[in-house]
């Protein structure tokens, strides 16, 4: 059985937002750490900690709250998995999609590592489109 770790972390973050949880615990791998770093850098996640328990590493994510409203709703955003193990989607640097005219981000896996669509266009690189966030 093939485990899709990217889909698992996106689903756990999405479910935590829908259930109005503040903290999410996900399994730590190189891919998940790089995706979480991008989410943290782009402001979708408030804080990240690495936790070790019985020879297993976990990432503990504090989700971003919308502090501008009086009734403190969670900061809402959408996560969508694009390329999956059964159907890989690749794009060159000219054909990387723009989400809402640049308001959202696309996370790609390139030969230089996992990066956002803006970084990939800046370096002139394409790759596998992992997911979209808006």
Curated annotation (Swiss-Prot):
The GO molecular function terms of this record are: rRNA binding; structural constituent of ribosome
GO annotations of cellular component type: chloroplast; ribonucleoprotein complex; ribosome
Whether RNA-binding counts among this entry's keywords is: yes
Which branch of life, at top level? Eukaryota
Q: What is its main location?
A: plastid
Q: Where are the transmembrane segments?
A: none
| Annotated function | One of the primary rRNA binding proteins, it binds directly to 16S rRNA central domain where it helps coordinate assembly of the platform of the 30S subunit.
Q: How does it assemble?
A: Part of the 30S ribosomal subunit.
Give the protein's recorded name. Answer: Small ribosomal subunit protein uS8c
């Amino acid at each position: 059985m093939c485990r899709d770790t990217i889909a698992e972390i996106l689903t756990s973050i999405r479910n935590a937002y829908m259930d109005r949880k503040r903290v999410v615990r996900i399994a730590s791998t190189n891919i998940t750490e790089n995706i979480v770093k991008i989410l943290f850098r782009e402001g979708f996640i408030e804080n990240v900690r690495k936790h070790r328990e019985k020879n297993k590493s976990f990432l503990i994510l504090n989700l971003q709250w919308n502090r501008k409203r009086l009734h403190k709703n969670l900061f809402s955003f959408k996560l969508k998995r694009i390329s999956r193990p059964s159907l890989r989607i690749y794009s060159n640097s000219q054909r990387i999609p723009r989400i809402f005219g640049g308001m959202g981000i696309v996370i790609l896996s390139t030969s230089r590592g996992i990066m956002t669509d803006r970084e990939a266009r800046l370096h002139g690189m394409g790759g596998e489109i992992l997911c979209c966030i808006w």
